[in-house]
Amino acid sequence: MLAVPASRATTPRRPRIGVVKFASCDGCQLTLLDLEDDLLAIADRLDIVEFAEATSNRSSGPFDILFVEGSISTPEQAVDIVRLRAATSTLVTIGACATSGGIQALRNWADHDAVRSLVYPDPEYVESLATATPVADHVAVDAELRGCPISPDQLREFVTATLAGRRPDLPDEAVCAECKRRNVVCVAVAEGVTCLGPVTRSGCGALCPAYGRGCYGCFGPRESANGEGLATWLGRDRDPADTARSFALFNAWSPPFRRVIDAAGGPPGPIDGRSIKEPADA
C-alpha cells in the first residue's frame, strides 16, 4: 500500500464546542471545569471556541456541540437562543434552569410587574419576560443533562460517548433505584420524611436520602413520573400547601411537578402571587 505523502495527509477536524449561559448561577458550567484531569485528557480532541468561565475565546458559531445553561428570562435571551440554535449541530441543555426553568420559574405563578417591583428599585429599566422558561420552549433541543447542578459523571459520559460516536447512557430510573443499590433505608417509609425520590430522575447517587433527608427533586421528573399520585400519598396527613411546597423548587415548572402545584393554587411562600401586592401607583 502506498503511503500518503505528508503534504497530502489530512487531520480530522476537532469538533467546535461552545458553552453559554442565560439566567442561571453558573453552577453547571463550574461542574464542567470541575472535571479537571478528565477534561484535560480530552482537551486535544476538542476545540473550545466559546466558554466565558474558562477562556477568553469568543465565538458566535458555528458549533458542533453547544452546552446551554440557564432559563430564557428576557427578550434578548429569547432572540439569542434562536440565533445560537441556527448555528449549532447538537444543542445540549445543562441543569435545571435550562431544562425546566429553574428556581426562578417560581415567579411564573406571580404577577410579573409585582415581582419586578419587589426585586428592583427601578423596575421600569428592567426588561424581562413574564415567565422564565426552559430552552426547549423556544428551540429544538438535542439532549438534556439534568440536575442542580448537573452530575459530573453524566457530563463525562455524554462527552466521551459523543466523541466515540455512541449514544450516551443517561438513566431515566427513579432515585429510589439508587437508594436500593446503595442499601439506603427509605426515609419516606421508615422516617415519614417528605421525599420526591419516586418521581425524580436518578443521577445524584441518592445523595440526600443517604444522609437521612428526603429527595428535593434536583434532577427533575423522570419520564413516567406520577406527581399527582405521590402528592396524594404525601398529602394524607398534611396541608395541601405543604405538599405543593415540596414540589415548588428547582424543577417546579416541569409539567409533572407543575400540575401538583397548580392543583394547590400555586406555590405557597413569599414568591406566591397571592402574597405579592400590586405595585403602588406613582
Residue ranges and their predicted role:
Residues 1-67, 77-78, 82-90, 113-282:
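Iron-sulfur (Fe-S) cluster-binding modules
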Residues 70-72, 96:
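Short glycine-/small-residue-rich Rossmann-like dinucleotide-binding loops
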Residues 92-94:
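Active-site neighborhood of phospho(di)ester-bond hydrolases with catalytic His/Asp-centered motifs
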Residues 97-102:
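Short gly/pro/ser/thr-enriched loop/turn and capping motifs at secondary-structure boundaries
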Residues 105-106:
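Active-site-proximal loop->helix
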